[in-house]
Amino acid sequence: MSTPFLSVRDLRVHFSSEDGMVKAVDGLSFDLDRGKTLGIVGESGSGKSVTNLAILGLHHPDHTEIEGEILLDGQDLLAASERELERLRGNKMAMVFQDALASLSPYHTIGKQIGETFRKHTGASKQEARARAIEMLTKVGIPQPNLRVDDYPHQFSGGMRQRAMIAMSLVCDPALLIADEPTTALDVTVQAQIMDLLKDLQQEFGTSIIFITHDLGVIADIADDVLVMYGGRCVERGTKKEVLRTPQHPYTWGLLGSMPTLEGPVDVPLSPIPGTPPSLLNPPTGCRFHPRCSFTEQVGGDRCSAQQPPLDLVSGRGAACHLTPEQRAEFFTDFAGTRAN
């Protein structure tokens, strides 16, 4: 069995606050192979972005407690010095943030910002960095890149700024790209263009991608494997086909039930998940989803509120739920029938 390119084991990220310790990520484990895309999906506050900022080493050490293990190509990132992390960021691993306008400096041209990353990690001259910036703008589909390289962020449209951010992230050919909801603020046409761009660039460079989103439709388009997060924990894992076609966790059923489908009748109402996400300052005991779950009675007793269900994986597939496999199959059949009728 080959060693995964990225391995995260029992990751815990807790933040200190005036009111206590916020358990933003609490015991998360996953692997990512070379050239593959892992989609991490969940509601706001589920721990998606916190996880990936921990991988990049971007949490403030004075207010954050991080435990566990993060291995990137065999290197322990949690044991790395800040100088070593600075060498890795932008070079071996990079991130595309959600709001490109807020991430780009308004005082510098697009070309200078892309070239600065290239110069920092390669020692290239200004002329070489400018040529590389034009090359990357060409790769991400910016028209007239030799002219637009001297434009400022406000002169780019939203989709073009996101393309520029992708160009900046890939300028040093990183092996790992973390995309934090990069299509959320874009219209659906530009979203599709950005998704196609990421897939094309992945095929060209062999990049491993972590794609963070709350949109299962986006996951269906780009991911190879899917990790569903809730309340700082993984509640379901599997391939894209397994998670989207035969989900095993009630939370995943809820996410799917809250989305419209093209195949089903138009008069079937969407089914929102009741309640609100848990406070990670004082999270529920047992299964963190149990206060919002419709199946606690089927489990029986107080098991859901008293015991945290294990995430038992078989060939990378599993869900953290006390329902038996037979119950999951039965309830999912009912759920799928409701969606189709």
Predicted features along the sequence, with ranges:
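A short, flexible loop at the N-terminus of ABC-type nucleotide-binding domains that lies
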Residues: S2-F5, H14-G27, L58-H63, S81-E84, ...
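P-loop NTP-binding/switch modules centered on Walker-like glycine-rich loops
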Residues: E43, G57, I178, P182, ...
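Conserved ABC transporter NBD signature motif
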Residues: E65-D76
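Conserved ABC ATPase "signature" region
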Residues: Q75-D76, Q127-L147, L256-G257
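Conserved ABC ATPase signature
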Residues: D151-F156, M160
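A short, proline-enriched helix->beta-strand linker immediately N-terminal to the Walker B motif
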Residues: V171-A175
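Charged, flexible cofactor/metal-binding loops and thiol motifs
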Residues: T239-N341
